[in-house]
Amino acid sequence: MVIQVDTREHKSEWERIQSQFDSLGVQYFRSKLYCGDYQSLDNAKLCIDRKKDLQERCGNVCQQHERFKAELIRAREAGIQLIILCEHGPDIKTVGDVYFWENPRKHKVIWKTVNGKRVKTVISDKAVDGCQLYKSLCTIRDKYGVRFEFCTKEETGRRIVELLS
């Protein structure tokens, strides 16, 4: 198998995955992909879009919604099955696990002294929580035919190879 890697993949992330590919004996080359980050030359209709964690997913769903939606539409119209591989860690193995995820940005508390009194301030109390993100992922899955997979950073290279095989 030869894997095509998008040139826009973040340098430090690519170097980590590149070393995993090297240890697995996977052949690869870099060039711009139509959508996603990884694709096998054996099947141009299957792409993997790697995300570093659920907080990046929140950014795609909320702040970068239009750009992300355009990529989903582009993949669907081209007949490409898009798999989003999220490297969140061992706690999240399925889309269902996302429901119970606690966004650290939502629950971060800072204590300030205001007029001599300690006041609790919640940072980003409007941040997306697991329940909201779960609903968004289910909508994306159902509307655009996207598949969501999860792994740890240590198994990303192996999971990419498995998913593209």
Q: Model-flagged regions — what are they?
A:
Residues 46-52:
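Conserved catalytic cores of phosphodiester-cleaving nucleases, focusing on short active-site segments
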Residues 1-43, 56-165:
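Non-catalytic C-terminal interaction segments of nucleic acid-processing enzymes
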